[in-house]
Amino acid sequence: MTLQWAAVATFLYAEIGLILIFCLPFIPPQRWQKIFSFNVWGKIATFWNKAFLTIIILLIVLFLDAVREVRKYSSVHTIEKSSTSRPDAYEHTQMKLFRSQRNLYISGFSLFFWLVLRRLVTLITQLAKELSNKGVLKTQAENTNKAAKKFMEENEKLKRILKSHGKDEECVLEAENKKLVEDQQKLKTELRKTSDALSKAQNDVMEMKMQSERLSKEYDQLLKEHSELQDRLERGNKKRL
C-alpha cells in the first residue's frame, strides 16, 4: 500500500472511531455541546470550511482515480487471460485489480463517512440546543407554578385574617385580596405561555429525533446499495474469469 492510500485508510479508521464515539448512548448531547464550545474550536472555525471542502475534493479525486484503475485492469484482465505468451501476466493483473478495488472501497467509504460525520456533528449540536431550551422553559414553568401557589396561600391567609378581624379592616383586605387575584391571573397567563413554549420545544426535539432516524435509514440504504454494487462487481469479475 502506497503512502497516500495508507493515509486514506488511516483517515477512514479515524472516521469510524469518531462516529462510534458520537453514537455512544451514555454521553449526552449537552456534553458534546460543551466540548464543541471550547475556545480552540473557535480559533480554527475560520479554516474549518476550507479544510472540509479540501478533504472532500481530495477524496473525490482519489475515488475517481481508483475507479479508473479498476476499469483499466478489468479490461486488461480479459485480454491477458486469453494470452498464453506471458503466464505470469494474469496473476500480476489480478493483483493490481485487487489493489485498485481495495483503494476504491477505501476512498469511497472515507468520502461517505466524512459527509456523515459532518451531518452527525450538526445534528448533535442542534439537539443539545433544543434540550437546553427545554430545560430552561421547564425551570421557568416550575418557578411560575411555585409563585402561583405562594400567592394562593397568601390569599387564603388573608381570607382567614379577614374573618378574624372586624369590619374596619374589611375594605383594605378586600383591596389587597383583589390585587392578589389579579396577580394570580397574571401568573396563570405567564404559566400558560411558558407551557406552550415548552410544548413547542418538545415538538422540536421530536422532529430532531425523526430527522436523525431518517438519516440512519438513509445510511442503511446506502450501505445496502453499496453491497449490491460490490456483489455485481464480483460477479462481473467471476464471469471474466
Swiss-Prot record:
Recorded coiled-coil stretches: 166-233
| Compartments, record wording | Endoplasmic reticulum membrane
| Its membrane topology | Multi-pass membrane protein
Give the residue ranges for region: Disordered.
193-223
Superkingdom is: Eukaryota
GO terms in the biological process aspect are: apoptotic process; endoplasmic reticulum to Golgi vesicle-mediated transport; intracellular protein transport; protein localization to endoplasmic reticulum exit site
Q: Where is the composition biased (Basic and acidic residues)?
A: 206-223
Q: Which residues lie on this side of the membrane: Cytoplasmic?
A: 28-43, 125-241
List keywords of the entry alphabetically.
Apoptosis, Coiled coil, Endoplasmic reticulum, ER-Golgi transport, Membrane, Protein transport, Transmembrane, Transmembrane helix, Transport
Name the Pfam families for this protein.
Bap31, Bap31_Bap29_C
Family assignment?
Answer: Belongs to the BCAP29/BCAP31 family.
Under PANTHER family, the record lists: B-CELL RECEPTOR-ASSOCIATED PROTEIN 29 (PTHR12701:SF5), BCR-ASSOCIATED PROTEIN, BAP (PTHR12701)
Explain the purpose of this protein. May play a role in anterograde transport of membrane proteins from the endoplasmic reticulum to the Golgi. May be involved in CASP8-mediated apoptosis.
Which protein, by its recorded name, is this?
B-cell receptor-associated protein 29
Species whose genome carries this gene: Pongo abelii (Sumatran orangutan)
